[in-house]
């Protein structure tokens, strides 16, 4: 009798445990991570700390544009704008269960894959495999502390050359004797820190280096102008090297006619889905302007690139994204020049981006709607769709 009672008791415990596990599983399925517009995430990746505090201007942007998260809330992209250690910590402080959050190891790999260093190596491999003369990027190079450039920046005597300011104006300045190897010295260059977004951490730098000139060829040049320019070039590059471990240098594409991107999502089973194209506008410094909210047919008309080449690039990106540990939204920024050439990968955004938002907004509202996505503010930031464009307005 006692044995039978014990068996029935154990059977009851098994059923209760099974029911509890089933209910817990169902609860986890119903739970989701709150959507969050944390546009400072790229800076948080650079800082690589759990307690990251963005600059006040960026804090204001995130607060003013918080309602943007409603665009992807309830979709398969529900969650943060981007992942980092700081994002994970923020969710912990919000009370999100640890089992719903990614591991630190996964976040470390996402940080590496999000770096422009990775994009630089990715482009080199892409060009070597596809071998298409219409593809640009052969001058895109990564420079770190192991590069001879590090010594050149810190020990070499100044050399006179030419710099290009953000307006594209050339001026003579002390730029430092720096050897960029295969990068042609007759062209302007754009310098980028490993992690940044919307034009931050990006500037146009010096050209026309002449190692044989070690004195000022123009004695009438204002020495203060020289000092400022040297600071804005060499010291910024030294800052990139010391704070983020390096920087990317590439040709400055003065003949650029279009910014566009390919948007993907990597599923947890590592299948990759091409979501579509996005077309956007940036300022000369790389700052975000707007995205077109239009049909794919209209966006392809704007891009106007050989379809076969685009399909080859899509296939390449899908194959290589599937080989990473990452899962989630991806945007690969590209550009087109006046002769029809395209840069296949300026950077890889392993996060939500304005291009994917534009795709979602087209699905929700079409191309002709005027929509205030965030509250109208007398001072601060506002997001809206107007005249077929997704824009972020700023009033200081």
How would you describe each model-predicted region?
Residues 231-286, 335-344, 353:
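Phosphate-binding site of ATP-dependent enzymes
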Residues 264-316, 349-375:
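ATP-dependent carboxylate/phosphate-activation module, predominantly the ATP-grasp catalytic core
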Residues 29, 42, 58-159, 164-166, ...:
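Conserved N-proximal alpha/beta basic substrate-recognition cap immediately N-terminal to
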Residues 184-205, 238-255, 332, 347:
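ATP-grasp fold ATP-binding core
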Residues 29, 165, 174, 179, ...:
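Intrinsic-disorder-associated, low-complexity terminal segments enriched in Asp/Asn/His/Tyr and depleted
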């Amino acid at each position: 009798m006692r044995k039978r009672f014990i068996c029935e008791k154990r059977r009851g415990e098994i059923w209760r445990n099974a029911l509890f596990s089933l209910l817990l599983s169902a609860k986890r399925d119903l739970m989701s991570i709150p959507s969050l517009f944390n546009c400072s995430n790229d800076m948080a990746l650079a800082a690589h700390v759990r307690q990251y505090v963005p600059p006040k201007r960026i804090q204001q942007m995130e607060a003013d544009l918080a309602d943007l998260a409603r665009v992807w809330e309830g979709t398969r992209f529900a969650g943060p704008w981007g992942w980092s250690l700081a994002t994970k910590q923020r969710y912990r402080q919000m009370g999100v269960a640890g089992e719903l959050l990614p591991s630190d190891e996964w976040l470390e790999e996402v940080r590496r894959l999000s770096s422009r260093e990775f994009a630089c190596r990715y482009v080199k491999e892409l060009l070597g495999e596809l071998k298409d003369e219409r593809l640009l990027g052969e001058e895109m190079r990564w420079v770190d502390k192991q590069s001879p450039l590090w010594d050149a920046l810190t020990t070499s005597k100044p050399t006179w050359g030419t710099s290009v300011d953000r307006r594209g104006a050339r001026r003579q300045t002390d730029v430092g004797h720096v050897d960029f190897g295969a990068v042609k010295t007759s062209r302007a260059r754009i310098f980028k820190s490993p992690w940044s977004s919307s034009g931050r951490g990006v500037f146009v730098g010096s050209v026309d280096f002449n190692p044989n000139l070690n004195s000022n060829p123009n004695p009438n040049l204002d020495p203060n102008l020289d000092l400022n320019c040297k600071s804005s070039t060499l010291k910024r590059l030294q800052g990139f090297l010391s704070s983020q471990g390096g920087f990317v240098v590439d040709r400055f594409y003065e003949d650029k006619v279009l910014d566009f991107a390919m948007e993907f999502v990597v599923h947890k089973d590592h299948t990759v889905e091409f979501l579509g194209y996005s077309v956007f506008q940036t300022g000369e410094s790389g700052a975000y302007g707007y995205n077109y909210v239009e049909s794919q047919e209209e966006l392809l008309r704007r891009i106007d690139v050989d379809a076969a080449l685009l399909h080859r690039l899509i296939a390449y990106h899908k194959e290589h994204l599937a080989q990473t540990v990452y899962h989630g939204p991806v945007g690969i920024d590209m550009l087109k020049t006046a002769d029809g050439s395209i840069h296949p990968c300026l950077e890889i955004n392993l996060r939500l981006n304005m291009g994917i938002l534009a795709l979602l907004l087209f699905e929700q509202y079409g191309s002709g709607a005027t929509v205030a996505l965030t509250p109208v503010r007398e001072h601060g930031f506002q997001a809206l769709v107007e005249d077929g464009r997704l824009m972020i307005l700023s009033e200081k």
